[in-house]
Amino acid sequence: MRAVDIIIKKRDKEQLTAEEIEFFVRGFTNGDIPDYQASAFAMAVMLNGMTPFETADLTLAMARSGQVLDLSEVVDIAVDKHSSGGVGDKTSVSVMPMVAACGLPVGKMSGRGLGFSGGTLDKLESIPGYRVDLTTDEFKKQLKEKGIVLTGQSLDLAPADGKMYALRDVTGTVPSTPLIASSIMCKKIAAGAQAIVLDVKTGLGAFMETLNEARELAELMVDIGRLAGRKTVALLSDMNQPLGNAVGNALEVIEAIDMLRGGGPADFREHCLHVAAHVLLLGKRAQDLEEARALAEKSITDGSALEKFRVLVAAQGGDVSYVDDLSKFERAKYVEVVNAPRGGFISQVHARSVGEAAVLLGAGRARKGDSVDHAVGFVIHKKVGDRVEEGQPLFEIHANEEAKLAEARLAVHSAHQFSNEIVLPLPLFYE
């Protein structure tokens, strides 16, 4: 078997066998197949696509390229959730303790932010001492003893995916739906997930801007899960405007903790309840979605979700006093409230523009390896459909560099659009 024959076969729109895909992935991972052939393969897939069977075979081959966690001796059913990323998406920080508080152990390996999309690890590191570098043995031990883990991905898991993503990033093949789907799912399978809830974002602040693109990705990932023997459910959620009010690292963790206390923005709370309910249902903690949602709500009202978050922070070396006293979080040097220039109804809060402005302030990364400023970001006071009067607070800027205030103010100001007519709120979920 030769790599060039596999490339030619995909170039000519033929279907690859599982053996051919396994050969290519294994060869690329161990260095027998050079980058230039892997780049040609990625472009052939980008242009000609893959069947769900091929994509499932690619996913499993990438998952098997490194260590595959077996959590069967640790938990009855290993559940995981994945968000395709967006602006203000701090869902995992709240949903994981909600689910764990309902008696369903959850272990999740999350990523860092890149570009306008924030990352869960960056948010959690705004709690001093919080470790995101657990070994796989520490991951298993904490999951068994505490019932909750939220850490970074082990280097031993799916190394083929890391190599392939680095190539895709510089060869114009990032937007390939089969390559996106296999990249997401291989990491979940390698991390031992048996049941997976996918929160696929669509809109101005999502990587899949149109509903059709998001639906195509969601359906393909569900197909991969089914073919790989994993129970998989996909939700399609809105990312035209930031989720919740806070955009930044510490600001988002504060909002997530506030939600666990029973407060927080209504849209963020509703989003978390819906996602948590699906995780609980897939994890067999409820008979139907209504019962699952009631369990999730109870975890907030009885304080058990907040307590589970304390357990998580303590287990991973974080300072638990920050959970109890939100004023301890690092604050930006400059906090400026920007008022509405006119009255009317909010018709748009462009999520990507807000996310890019947060990167400008230092909340995110322009390049992999950049450090982040945990204190900076924005608090959005008015969302799509809200009425605002001239002079009312529209948003807050939290900045540590005075020189960046004007540009950030202009960017987020421009992200807001107004209408004289009544505007309906955006849906939280489409499907």
Where are these regions (language model features)?
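Short beta-strand segments
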Residues: 109, 143, 151-154, 199-203, ...
